[in-house]
Amino acid sequence: NPRLVLHYTLPGNSFVRWKSDISNASPSLGDLSAVEQIVDSLQIRRGNPNLKAYLRYHTELTYEWQKGIFYSNLWGAYDYQPNAIMDEKYQDGDKIVQTWDNQKDWQKLSGRLTLRVGPIKDMLQFSFTGGVNHYMSHGNTYSHTYTNWYCNAEASFNYKQFSLYWQMNTNWNNFWGETLSGGENIQVLV
C-alpha cells in the first residue's frame, strides 16, 4: 500500500506534517455469501456474491506547536472511498432486507483541535480537544450526510502520594452507508 509522509519543522517549536495513503478493502466471506439469514420476524440479512474490492484514499494535515507548558495540535483529514461496500435496506413483501453492495462512494471530512496546559509546578495539567466529523454516504439508491461534533476534557492533579484525575468525553459517532453507530457520553473521576 503506497504511503507518503512529508514533515517540515518550523521555527518556534512547531511543525507541519502531511500524510497520505491508499489501501485496499476486500469484501468479507460473510458478505460475499449468497446465504439468507432470518434476523427476526421482520428482518432478513442477505449476502451479495457480486461484491468487488475497492480502494480507500486517506490524507491528513497536522500542525503542532509547543512552548513551555503550552501545547496545541490542529489536525484535519479527508477520506474518500469510491465503490465502497456499504449496507442498503429495502422492503421485500412484509420483510426488511439488509444487504451489501458496492455503492457510489463514502467520504469523511474531519477536524480536531487540542489545547493543553501543564504540567504546572509538576502537579496540575489541563487538556481540551474539540472536533467534528462530517460523513457523506452516497449509495446507489440513497444519499445521506451526518455531522458529529465531539469533545474531550481532562484534568489531573498530582501531589506527593496523592493523585486525582477527571475526564469527560462526548460520544464519537460513526456513519457508514445507512448505519449510525457510536458510543456514550462519559465522565471519569479517579
What is the predicted role of each segment?
Residues 12, 55, 105-107, 147, ...:
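Residue-level preference for beta-strand/loop junctions
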Residues 1-81, 165-167, 173, 188-190:
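Structural signature of Gram-negative outer-membrane beta-barrels, strongest in the C-terminal barrel
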Residues 30, 37-39, 86, 93-95, ...:
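A generic membrane alpha-helix/interface feature
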Residues 27-31, 121-124, 159:
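Short low-complexity stretches enriched in small and charged residues
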Residues 6, 16, 63, 113-115, ...:
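Hydrophobic beta-strand residues in large extracellular and virion-surface proteins
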Residues 130-137, 145-190:
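C-terminal beta-barrel architecture of Gram-negative outer-membrane proteins
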Residues 46-48, 52, 65, 71-129, ...:
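Outer membrane beta-barrel strand-and-loop segments of large Gram-negative receptors
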